[in-house]
Structures are given as structure tokens and as C-alpha cells.
């Protein structure tokens, strides 16, 4: 993670030492592994290393073969040799990011066994730390959209800091964007983000306070990670020098160029999609879920459609035919701290591809195979799922959805 920018000892206190410091480093480490794993997952989908595979007449969706992946990692210079590749993938397995498809092997082996990213089968564990990390990542992506101007260079106590937000303005924005219903709720969210090391005061001197104090995100979620970084036991913040174009740092009143978050796009840059509930909403996994905040990335997401859950294709005309065997239902779904908990796929009409059984959508009565008629009063029968996705993700936290359900379904 990038420090909010101090090059000296200013702002260091007891909160960064002892057990608190160790806990903070572990949270930083976890966050880096999560981002690295997600970037690898998207890349493997893009290059078709992850795909449906068959063994003994059974199909295993969204899998990769361990031996083939090791070949791929070496070929793409993500690992120097097979032993190193095994160690790297074991790091992801130890964090619960990947697993053997039948959970028969805890060790990652250089053999023809099927493994899968847990985000691709909906089994990724969502503890409080992961939830806070995902929420922070979504807010970061939203703030980094071209039309958002909340993050600005600002000065505090005579020192200039890059990519800062003012606490009071950030709280206003959270309520305005539907991320929180009240200012108090927004402030509680900021306290959680700070406790989990996602945001910090620019000089690390203050907790989060509704004031004109300046804060920054500690992590550049968009930085392209190298898999080899997983073997580096140093604090993630030490992996980026002050000369890095991705490094958040404070600037004095000299004429040094600001190198904070320059738009550097390496070849084959991974397009990170941060709108997630157990899986990226536009990823290949059939268990991706809508997040409670939009993805407004300037880059198109990596797209890859899972097999449809529908038994047969259905047209909008068929749904609207008088006497057709479909019943209309309306749901009001309030997003929780993680999201709404469902996936839309298909086109003209879209359908519900997956529903998180523990999410708000399931609680409201949503089921797979239902067809989406309208979102917040807007008819969407004749658009594709990308349009519906954008409508949901850029709308309010509470959504009203009308669906049609086949009576025999």
C-alpha cells in the first residue's frame, strides 16, 4: 500500500507500533494479495486459461489446470521456474483465493488437477476485513472516475499532498451517492475504512473527524501487480519508491514534479473491475454480484459470459403476449454494505443469472430465471445486460425492480 505520503517521522505514533502495527501490516498484506489475485484471475479469463473443463463426463466450470497454469506463469515471466510458480499459487491458496475444485488437495501441485478461483464459484469467504476492503476498492474506483473531482491536490500545515479529500466533503459525497443514508452512517463507514487501513489522515496525525482535515487512500488499487511480489515479506508500501508514478506522497513547496498516479498503461494492462459481491460483476464467474456502488472506470471491463441458466431463449415479445405463462413481480431491494446480491445477464430481455442466497435480493424474493422488466420505473425489456448493469450501478442504493417469472419455472 502507498503511504499517504510522509518521508519523515511526522505523524508516527503508538498506533503504528507493537501489536497494532503488526495488525496493520497484516491487513495491508491481505489487501495486496487480494488485488494481485484478482488481477491474475481477470488476466487468466482474458487469455482463456480459465474455462469450462470436462473430466469423466462431468463438466467443471471456470477452472484451470495446475500444470498448464505453471507453464503459463513461466512463459509470461510471472515466475522464474516451476518451484517458484508453485510457491506463488500456494500463497493464493493459503489466503482462500483459489482451491481445488473438489477441495481434496490443500497443496497446489504441479499436476493435471483442476483448480478454481473462489470468486468464480461463489465460495470466497467474506469476513469483515474482506468486506471493508471491497467497499474501499469500490469507493476508490468511483472517486477515480474522470467526472469525479473530489480527489484534489491540497495543502495542510504548509505541506502539499496529492489525491486528497476533505473529510466533510467526503461525508457529503457518501450521502449524496447513496453510500450512506445519513451523515452519521457515512462517518461510521469512514471509521471502518480507517480501522482497516484503507484511508488515513495525510500525515497520520488524526483519526477520521468530520472536519476540514485531509485524508487519502493508502492503496493504489489500479497499480499492476507482479505475482512475484507475493514472495516479498516486506511491507507493501516499501515496494514503491517515491519515484514511482503510482506512489502517493506529499510534496513540499519546491518545483519537483508530481508523479502521483500518472496515467501509465503497460502493455496488456489489466482492466480492473471493482464492482463486486463475491465476484466481479462483469467477470466470467456465474456467481458475480452487483455491488452497492458503481464502476465508472474509463476502461471497458474484461467480459466473458457464463453459460445461461435459461432452459431456452425467450424474447420480449413472448413475455408481452396476452395470456403468456408469466407472472409479474416487483421487488424493493436495499443494498447492504457489500451489495445487492444478484447477477443480470442476457439481452432483450435480460434475466437473473445468479442470486446470492444470503444477499438482499434473495431476501426480497428474487430468483434465477426471472426476466427483468424495469429498474426504478424505466423499462429495460429491449436493452442488453450491460445497459441494465450500468443503470443499477449508477443508481441509488435502493432499487425497485419489476420482473416476470415463468409460472412453470
UniProtKB/Swiss-Prot annotation:
Changing residue 326 to F: Does not affect phosphorylation. GO terms for cellular component: lysosomal membrane; plasma membrane. Phosphorylation weakens interaction with MTOR within mTORC1 and mTORC2. Phosphorylated at Ser-286, Ser-287 and Ser-291 in response to mitogenic stimulation by MTOR: DEPTOR is either directly phosphorylated by MTOR or indirectly via proteins kinases that are activated by MTOR, such as CK1/CSNK1A1. Phosphorylation at Ser-286, Ser-287 and Ser-291 promotes ubiquitination by the SCF(BTRC) complex, followed by degradation. Phosphorylation at Ser-235 by MAPK3/ERK1 promotes deubiquitination by USP7, enhancing its stability. A motif (DDEX motif) lies at residues 217-235. Residues 36-119, 145-219 form the DEP domain. Changing residue 235 to A: Decreased phosphorylation, leading to impaired deubiquitination by USP7. The modification N-acetylmethionine is found at residue 1. Changing residue 231 to D: Decreased phosphatidic acid-binding. InterPro entries: DEP_dom, DEPTOR_DEP_1, DEPTOR_DEP_2, mTOR-Rac_regulators, PDZ, PDZ_sf, WH-like_DNA-bd_sf, WH_DNA-bd_sf. GO terms for biological process: G protein-coupled receptor signaling pathway; intracellular signal transduction; negative regulation of cell size; negative regulation of protein kinase activity; negative regulation of TOR signaling; negative regulation of TORC1 signaling; negative regulation of TORC2 signaling; positive regulation of autophagy. GO terms for molecular function: GTPase activator activity; guanyl-nucleotide exchange factor activity; phosphatidic acid binding; protein kinase inhibitor activity; protein serine/threonine kinase inhibitor activity. Changing residue 298 to A: In mutant 13A; abolished phosphorylation, leading to promote interaction with MTOR without affecting ability to bind phosphatidic acid. SMART domains: DEP, PDZ. A motif (BetaTrCP degron motif) lies at residues 286-291. The keyword Repeat applies. Pfam families: DEP. Changing residue 225 to A: Decreased phosphatidic acid-binding. It comes from the Eukaryota. Keywords: Acetylation, Lipid-binding, Lysosome, Membrane, Phosphoprotein, Repeat, Ubl conjugation. The modification Phosphothreonine is found at residues 241, 259, 295. The modification Phosphoserine is found at residues 235, 244, 258, 263, 265, 280, 282-283, 286-287, 291, 293, 297-299. The keyword Repeat applies. Its main location: membrane. Negative regulator of the mTORC1 and mTORC2 complexes: inhibits the protein kinase activity of MTOR, thereby inactivating both complexes. DEPTOR inhibits mTORC1 and mTORC2 to induce autophagy. In contrast to AKT1S1/PRAS40, only partially inhibits mTORC1 activity. PANTHER family: DEP DOMAIN PROTEIN, DEP DOMAIN-CONTAINING MTOR-INTERACTING PROTEIN. This is DEP domain-containing mTOR-interacting protein. The lineage of its organism: Eukaryota, Metazoa, Chordata, Craniata, Vertebrata.
